[in-house]
Curated annotation (Swiss-Prot):
GO terms for biological process: arabinan catabolic process; xylan catabolic process. The lineage of its organism: Eukaryota, Viridiplantae, Streptophyta, Embryophyta, Tracheophyta. This is Beta-xylosidase/alpha-L-arabinofuranosidase 2. Residues 1-33 form the signal peptide. PANTHER family: BETA-XYLOSIDASE_ALPHA-L-ARABINOFURANOSIDASE-LIKE PROTEIN, SUGAR HYDROLASE-RELATED. Its EC number is 3.2.1.37, 3.2.1.55. A bifunctional beta-xylosidase/alpha-L-arabinosidase, exo-enzyme that acts synergistically with endohydrolases. Releases xylose and arabinose from cell walls. InterPro entries: BXL, Fn3-like, Glyco_hydro_3_C, Glyco_hydro_3_C_sf, Glyco_hydro_3_N, Glyco_hydro_3_N_sf, Glycoside_hydrolase_SF, Ig-like_fold. It catalyses: Hydrolysis of (1->4)-beta-D-xylans, to remove successive D-xylose residues from the non-reducing termini; Hydrolysis of terminal non-reducing alpha-L-arabinofuranoside residues in alpha-L-arabinosides. The active site is at D303. SUPFAM superfamilies: (Trans)glycosidases (SSF51445), Beta-D-glucan exohydrolase, C-terminal domain (SSF52279). The keyword S-adenosyl-L-methionine does not apply.
Length: 774
C-alpha cells in the first residue's frame, strides 16, 4: 500500500522523520499532542446525544447503525466513504482517520498514528517472514495481542486510531518480490494459520465477545498481488492472469482463513487486475466471495488510490463517476484516498448508483466503529480505558520481541559443530559486514519508532570482546573495503559476517532483478573467510531468499544463519543463537532458489504448476522440482531429533451412498461435500526425542504427497506443531487429520476434491502410506 500520492515507504519514512525533526526544532525538543482519545456520543458534553438510538449501548449494533445511517445526508454518507472520514458535528460524530498500520508493531506509516513525547515509540517485532519461520502458531497470536494492547494505549492518549490495515497475507511465490518480507511465506497453510492467529491476537477482547473488537485488523492485499515494480511492470497496471485452480488452491486460502477462522473486520482489495478485472471493482471477488461465500463481518477497503488507479492507470471506466459506482456496486465500502469522496455524489446524480448502495457501504463502516466502542462514549470508562504510556514498550513486550527473533532465526549450515561459540573461550571476535551494525535495517518496512535498537555488533559486544569493520559502506557494496576486514578476521578467534539486504534492495515498489548478494558482498565474504583464523559464521539479513551457493559449498564458511529482518532486539537475538543461549529452531518459510531460476522465470508468470511443454518449472516447494539452494522447511538445531510413528491408519474408507456414481465407475477423486465427508478424520501419533543435551524446540511437520490427479502438488503441508524438549527428553505429538479438508486438493475448475488412492505421509525422514478408498 502506498499513500494517496503513491509514495514508497522509503519516502514515507523520510517525510515522517522530517516532520518530526521540524516539530522538535519548533517546540524546543518536545512534540505536543492531544492526550485524550477522539470519540462519538460524548453525552457529558452534549446530553441531547443520549436521545439518539445510535448512542444507546443497550441496542444491538445493527439497530444503532441503522438509526445512524437514516439520520445522515447523502453528503455526510459520502464523506464517510474515505479514510479521512468527515465529522458530522450536528450528531456529535468527530472526524475519524481509518488508516493506521500494525504489520509487526504499531507503525507511524499512515496518518492515523503518530508518536510524541507522551509515547515516543512502540515495540517493533521482527518482520512477519521471520515470525512465520518460528512455525509457532501461539506466538503469532501472542504478538498480535501485544500489538493491540499498545495500539489501544496509544489510542487512549490521542495518538492512534482503532483500525489497522494489517496483516499482509499474500503468498510469497517469487523471491524477487520486494514485499515478501511482509508476508508469512510461500505455503498456503502456514499463511492461513498466521493470518487467523495474528488477527485473533489483534481483535479478540478479553471477554471473548466476537461482536466486540479490541482493534480492527485488515487482511491484505486481495488477491493474487505479488508484483510491485519489476523491469518496468508496475502493480498499478499489472494484470495477474491466474487459473481458477491456482486461485483457489494457492492465492485465496489465507484470505478465506482470515475471514472464516480469524473473523477479521476488514479485507483490502489490491491494485492489480485479476484476469482483466480490477480487484476493487470485481463483484465476483468482493460480493461473491468475501461477503457471499465467506460471510465477512466488516468492511472492504481499497488499497490507497486503487479506485483512482483503475480509472486513470487501467482505464477500466470512461468516467470517474463510473469508477466510483462500479467499485461500490462490486462491494467496496471504504476508499483509501479521496476518490469516492469526490465522485460518488455525482455518480448518484447521474443515476449510476442508488443511495441504497451508499447506505450499505457506510453501514459496514459504522458497524465496525460500533464494535470498537467508538460510539460508546468516553474510552476511559470502557474496557482497555486504563491502558496508557505505561503499557507501551514494557520490559515484557521488549523481551517478547527478542524471543520472537530467536524463535525465527534459521541455522542453515553448521560444519563440525562450529556453533555455538563458547563465550568463555572467545577472547576476540571479528564482526564484519554492511549489516553488522545495522539498526533501521533490522526493522524492515511498515515500521514504527522502536523502543530501542540492539544491533548485531552491540549484541555480540555484550558477550565477548569484538573488533568491527564494515567491509562495505552500505548494502549495495559497490566498493568493498577489504583490508581492515581481512586484518581483524586473520587474528580473531572467530568471525561473524553480517550481510544481506535492506529497503534499498527489496521494498514496496522495488522488486529485485537478481537474488545474489548485492554488489561486492560475495567477494567480501569469500576473501574474509579465506584468511580467517577461526570459524566463520555468515548471517544473512533479508526478507527474500538469496543464492548463497558459494557459501554453502565453501568449507571455510562453517555456519550460515538466516536472520530475516529481526526487529528492534535482533542483535541480541543473533548473539543469543551464536553463543548457544538459545538453540535455533526456525525453519525456512520459503524456497531459496538459485539465480538460474530467476534468470529464466519471468516474475509476471502467476502459474504455480510446472509446464513441461514450455519448460516452465513451477513455483514453491509444492510444485517446483528443480535444484534449490535451501528448501522450504530447512533449518537445523544444536540438537538432533528422532521421530517415531506410534499410531496411524493405513486405510481410510469413505462412506458413500449406495446410489453414488463413484460406486459404479472408477472415480479418481470425490467432491468434498456431502455426508461422506462429515466426521471423516483420523489421528496420527508420533514420538519425538531430543537426542542432544541442550533444550530445544522442534517443529514437527506433517506433509502429504497425494495421488497424481488434477495436477496435484508433489507435496503439501497438512499440519505443524512446535514442541519444547529438554535435553534427552521426548514427547508425544498428535495430529488430527480431516480427510476431506486436510487431504483435499483443488481440481482444474476450482472444485475441492479428495483424491482416492495412496497418499504418502511424511514426518521428518519417516514415510507412511495411507490409502483413501471407497
Amino acid at each position: 500500500m502506498a499513500s494517496v500520492e503513491n509514495r514508497t515507504p522509503n519516502v514515507s519514512v523520510f517525510l515522517c522523520f522530517f516532520v518530526l525533526f521540524a516539530t522538535l526544532l519548533l517546540s524546543g525538543g518536545r512534540v505536543s499532542s492531544q492526550t485524550s482519545a477522539v470519540f462519538a456520543c460524548d453525552v457529558a458534553k452534549n446530553p441531547a446525544l443520549a436521545n439518539y438510538g445510535f448512542c444507546n449501548k443497550k441496542l444491538s449494533v445493527d439497530a444503532r447503525v441503522k438509526d445512524l445511517v437514516r439520520r445522515l445526508t447523502l453528503q455526510e454518507k459520502v464523506g464517510n466513504l474515505v479514510n479521512s472520514a468527515v465529522d458530522v458535528s450536528r450528531l456529535g460524530i468527530p472526524k475519524y482517520e481509518w488508516w493506521s498500520e500494525a504489520l509487526h508493531g504499531v507503525s507511524n506509516i499512515g496518518p492515523g498514528t503518530h508518536f510524541s513525547n507522551v509515547i515516543p515509540g512502540a515495540t517493533s517485532f521482527p518482520m512477519p517472514i521471520l515470525i512465520a519461520a518460528s512455525f509457532n502458531a501461539s506466538l503469532f497470536q501472542t504478538i498480535g495481542k501485544v500489538v493491540s494492547t499498545e495500539a489501544r494505549a496509544m489510542h487512549n492518549v490521542g495518538l492512534a486510531g482503532l483500525t489497522y490495515w494489517s496483516p499482509n497475507i499474500n503468498i510469497f511465490r517469487d523471491p524477487r518480490w520486494g514485499r515478501g518480507q511482509e508476508t508469512p511465506g510461500e505455503d498456503p497453510l502456514l499463511a492461513s494459520k498466521y493470518a487467523a492467529g495474528y488477527v485473533k491476537g489483534l481483535q479478540q477482547t478479553d471477554d471473548g465477545d466476537s461482536n466486540k473488537l479490541k482493534v480492527a485488523a485488515c487482511c491484505k492485499h486481495y488477491t493474487a498481488y505479488d508484483v510491485d515494480d519489476w523491469k518496468g511492470v508496475q502493480r498499478y497496471t499489472f494484470n495477474a492472469v491466474v487459473t481458477q485452480q491456482d486461485l483457489d488452491d494457492t492465492y485465496q486460502p489465507p484470505f478465506k482463513s482470515c475471514v472464516i477462522d480469524g473473523n477479521v473486520a476488514s479485507v483490502m482489495c489490491s491494485y492489480n487486475q485479476v484476469n482483466g478485472k480490477p480487484t476493487c471493482a470485481d463483484p465476483d471477488l468482493l460480493k461473491g466471495v468475501i461477503r457471499g461465500k465467506w460471510k465477512l463481518n466488516g468492511y472492504i477497503v481499497s488499497d490507497c488510490d486503487s479506485v483512482d488507479v483503475l480509472f486513470k492507470n487501467q482505464h477500466y471506466t470512461k468516467t470517474p463517476e463510473e469508477a466510483a459506482a462500479k467499485s461500490i456496486l462490486a462491494g467496496l465500502d471504504l476508499n483509501c484516498g479521496s476518490f469516492l469522496g469526490r465522485y460518488t455524489e455525482g455518480a448518484v446524480k447521474q443515476g449510476l448508483i442508488g443511495e441504497a448502495s451508499i447506505n450499505n457501504a457506510v453501514y459496514n463502516n459504522f458497524a465496525t466503529l460500533m464494535r470498537l466502542g467508538f460510539f460508546d462514549g468516553d474510552p476511559s470508562k470502557q474496557p482497555y480505558g486504563n491502558l496508557g504510556p505505561k503499557d507501551v514498550c514494557t520490559s515484557a513486550n521488549q523481551e517478547l520481541a527478542r524471543e520472537a527473533a530467536r524463535q525465527g532465526i534459521v541455522l542453515l549450515k553448521n560444519c563440525a559443530g562450529s556453533l555455538p561459540l563458547n563465550a568463555k573461550a572467545i577472547k576476540s571476535l571479528a564482526v564484519i559486514g554492511p549489516n553488522a551494525n545495522a539498526t533501521r535495517a533490522m526493522i524492515g518496512n511498515y515500521e514504527g519508532i522502536p523502543c530501542k535498537y540492539t544491533s548485531p555488533l552491540q549484541g555480540l559486544t555484550a558477550l565477548v570482546p569484538t573488533s568491527f569493520a564494515a567491509g562495505c559502506p552500505d548494502v549495495q557494496c559497490t566498493n568493498a573495503a577489504l583490508d581492515d576486514a581481512k586484518k581483524i578476521a586473520a587474528s580473531a578467534d572467530a568471525t561473524v559476517i553480517v550481510v544481506g539486504a535492506n529497503l534499498a534492495i527489496e521494498a514496496e515498489s522495488h522488486d529485485r532483478i537478481n537474488i545474489l548478494l548485492p554488489g561486492q558482498q560475495q567477494q567480501l565474504v569469500t576473501e574474509v573467510a579465506n584468511v580467517a583464523k577461526g570459524p566463520v559464521i555468515l548471517a544473512i539479513m533479508s526478507g527474500g531468499g538469496m543464492d548463497v551457493s558459494f557459501a554453502k559449498t565453501n568449507k571455510k564458511i562453517t555456519s550460515i544463519l538466516w536472520v530475516g529482518y529481526p526487529g528492534e532486539a535482533g542483535g541480541a537475538a543473533i548473539a543469543d543463537v551464536i553463543f548457544g543461549y538459545h538453540n535455533p529452531s526456525g525453519r525456512l518459510p520459503m524456497t531459496w532458489y538459485p539465480q538460474s531460476y530467476v534468470d529464466k522465470v519471468p516474475m509476471t508468470n502467476m502459474n504455480m504448476r510446472p509446464d513441461p511443454a514450455t519448460g516452465y518449472p513451477g513455483r514453491t516447494y509444492r510444485f517446483y522440482k528443480g535444484e534449490t539452494v535451501f528448501s522450504f522447511g530447512d533449518g537445523i538445531s544444536y540438537s538432533t531429533f528422532e521421530h517415531k510413528l506410534v499410531k496411524a491408519p493405513q486405510l481410510v474408507s469413505v462412506p458413500l451412498a449406495e446410489d453414488h456414481v463413484c460406486r459404479s465407475s472408477k472415480c479418481k477423486s470425490l467432491d468434498v461435500v456431502g455426508e461422506h465427508c462429515q466426521n471423516l478424520a483420523f489421528d496420527i501419533h508420533l514420538r519425538i526425542k531430543n537426542k542432544g543435551k541442550m533444550s530445544s524446540s522442534q517443529t514437527v511437520f506433517l506433509f502429504s504427497t497425494p495421488p497424481a490427479v488434477h495436477n496435484a502438488p508433489q507435496k503439501h503441508l497438512l499440519a505443524f506443531e512446535k514442541v519444547l524438549l529438554t535435553g534427552k527428553s521426548e514427547a508425544l505429538v498428535s495430529f488430527k487429520v480431516d480427510v476431506c479438508k486436510d487431504l483435499g486438493l483443488v481440481d482444474e475448475l476450482g472444485n475441492r476434491k479428495v483424491a482416492l488412492g495412496k497418499h504418502m505421509l511424511h514426518v521428518g525422514d519417516l514415510k507412511h502410506p495411507l490409502s483413501v478408498m471407497i
